[in-house]
Swiss-Prot record:
GO terms for biological process: translation. Keywords: Ribonucleoprotein, Ribosomal protein. This is Small ribosomal subunit protein uS10. Involved in the binding of tRNA to the ribosomes. Transmembrane segments: none annotated.
Length: 102
């Protein structure tokens, strides 16, 4: 019989907020008796946007902006119902995107 595993992927633009959220999840899972693997840092996505500085002329004058998306992966091995209930009640910041797979 295959043991159950919860895989949590976190994404955020601010890596400090992301690390705090990952730490909260790990502490909550360990407190309820589940074993945890992670948080594993995944590669950071970097999107670069180039725009013209001037609305009319000066094609050579451009400005570049970048947006970085930081990601973390947490595996909760052998979760019990208490672990799932505690994770459901966990309050995380709005800037962190959470994707959960069972």
């Amino acid at each position: 019989m295959k043991s159950q595993k919860i895989r949590i992927r976190l994404k955020a633009f601010d890596h400090h907020m992301l690390d705090q959220s990952a730490q909260k999840i790990v502490e909550t899972a360990r407190r309820t008796g589940a074993s945890v693997a992670g948080p594993v840092p995944l590669p950071t996505e970097k999107s670069i946007y180039t725009i013209l500085r001037s609305p009319h002329v000066n094609k050579d004058s451009r400005e570049q902006f970048e947006m970085r998306t930081h990601k973390r992966l947490i595996d909760i091995l052998e979760p019990n119902p208490k672990t799932v209930d505690a994770l459901m009640r966990l309050d995380l910041p709005a800037g962190v995107d959470i994707e959960i797979k069972l």
